Amino acid sequence: MASCCENSCAVDALHGKQRSTLIKVLWINAIMFIAILAAAFYGKSTALLSDSLDNLGDALTYGLSLYAVTRGPTIKARVALFKGVLIFIAASLVIVQIIHRLVNPVLPSYEVMSIFSIAGLVANGICLFLLWRHRNEDINMSSVFECSRNDIASNLSVILAAIGVWVFNSGIPDIIIATLLAAILLRSAARVIKGALSELA
């Protein structure tokens, strides 16, 4: 009986730590989504737009993960599957914007891109640090960690895009990086969906 109680307390403690971490990273991503989305439209950057949609997807993902923390493996797998679908939708929106920019080219602001991609990198670095200890605990937390890791790559890519826009005085580097980010999102969506489906099988 004591052993059962200890196990139950340990599980409750783990869920409490997961919930606390998810609340923190949810707020960070929600704030960064609003800031980077505004910057993307102001700076006319498709790469920044993809970055902001990534933050929105993560904020929604963390909200869903909060729901799944105390649920069983099947519910967690279903939530992970939904996360994968959200990532896929974000990638699709980026692809639509890329096509729009190819048809209607503009020169993005490399200053805006640089400032907000660096701010995003710092914010997502904090999120990754907070999520690191939870990355192998279950399918729910591993899929959350996957999202956060993608954000770091996304921010670094936008910084490279900003440098490219500055050096070449062209919007093409922005489109190239946005395309790469869309590919990363699609790959991540496939990985999360595959993992969730294997859990549900």
Range-by-range predicted roles:
Residues M1-A201:
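Alpha-helical transmembrane cores and adjacent cytosolic helix/loop segments
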